[in-house]
Amino acid sequence: MTDPVLRRVIEIVKQVAGPQRTPAVVGPSTLLAGGGFWLDSMELFEVILACEAAFGSVFRGLGEDAARVLHTAGSLATAIRARTQAQPRG
């Protein structure tokens, strides 16, 4: 896996899910909730906090897009990448 954002997102999600709920094969299309890592709402919140610690404040103003962003490891990585590129540097 060459995408550093996706690689870090997967590391974070694996840490939150733990080894018992980490699928044998994990990639961009792996679901964060049912059928994938089986994360509940509190664990998804942990993922959000860990991603904010790793990448900065990328979830502010997410609103109705939250369900789409938190669907798969890839959708989360894509949203983080888009929001970190859009943030002013300084």
List each language-model region with its residue ranges.
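Phosphopantetheine-dependent thiolation modules in NRPS/PKS and related acyl-activating systems
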Residues: 1-39, 43-90
